[in-house]
């Protein structure tokens, strides 16, 4: 295991964006599989396009964006470790988290083949409960991550915590899809 981690660390040093893209894609996909198989118990009815969408989000959209964001946060000109950490976490959670979650719900809706109005509906239904859950998990986690973990490993640390978080995101995103596909659920809303 130590040899594998050493190779991964060397790869991250040589190709940080690509390494984080691959890690994020795998871990976002893992979260969706957990959501579908362990929580929703879909079995053979696994929604592969849903998994492909969340893998695409994690690997192609999320990872490069967060990689750049973490490097930007590192430039905050505060020399003392903990004041800099709290400044970074504040910017991350109250500035960046709302943007990236909005991007998630919008991108997932568009990848499902739906229009901007559908994205607005999904955002209104899912954004605030998801943001509150994000803050409960990621504010304490990011204090530790940004205060103690070297920059090149921060996205990997986030991705490790993201396995259960991605299962939650997948469920939040699918919740709106189920209502759209179930005429009984739609008629109950009216």
Curated annotation (Swiss-Prot):
Its membrane topology, per UniProt? Multi-pass membrane protein
Where does this chain mainly localize? mitochondrion
Which residue spans traverse the membrane? 16-36, 54-74, 91-111, 131-151
Q: Where in the cell is it found?
A: Mitochondrion inner membrane
Which keywords does this Swiss-Prot/TrEMBL entry list? Membrane, Mitochondrion, Mitochondrion inner membrane, Transmembrane, Transmembrane helix
Q: Provide GO CC annotations from the record.
A: cytoplasm; mitochondrial inner membrane; mitochondrion
- Name any Gene Ontology BP term: ethanol metabolic process
Instruction: Report the function annotation for this chain.
Output: May be involved in cellular response to stress. Required to maintain mitochondrial DNA (mtDNA) integrity and stability.
Query: Which family is annotated?
Result: Belongs to the peroxisomal membrane protein PXMP2/4 family.
The protein in question is named Protein SYM1
- Which organism is the protein's source? Cryptococcus neoformans var. neoformans serotype D (strain JEC21 / ATCC MYA-565) (Filobasidiella neoformans)
Question: What lineage is on file?
Answer: Eukaryota, Fungi, Dikarya, Basidiomycota, Agaricomycotina
């Amino acid at each position: 295991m130590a040899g594998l981690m050493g190779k991964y660390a060397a790869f991250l040093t040589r190709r940080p964006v690509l390494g984080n893209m691959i890690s994020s894609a795998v871990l976002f996909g893992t979260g969706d599989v957990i959501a579908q198989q362990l929580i929703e118990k879909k079995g053979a009815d696994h929604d592969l396009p849903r998994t492909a969408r969340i893998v695409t989000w994690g690997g192609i959209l999320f990872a490069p964006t967060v990689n750049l964001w973490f490097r930007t946060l590192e430039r905050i000109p505060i020399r003392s470790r903990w004041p800099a950490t709290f400044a970074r976490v504040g910017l991350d959670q109250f500035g960046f988290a709302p943007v990236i979650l909005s991007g998630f719900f919008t991108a997932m809706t568009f990848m499902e083949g739906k229009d901007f109005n559908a994205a607005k509906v999904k955002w209104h239904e899912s954004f605030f409960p998801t943001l509150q859950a994000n803050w409960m998990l990621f504010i304490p986690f990011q204090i530790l991550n940004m205060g103690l973990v070297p920059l090149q490993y921060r996205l990997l640390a986030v991705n490790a915590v993201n396995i259960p978080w991605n299962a939650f995101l997948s469920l939040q995103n699918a919740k709106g899809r189920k209502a759209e596909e179930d005429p009984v659920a739609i008629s109950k809303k009216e």
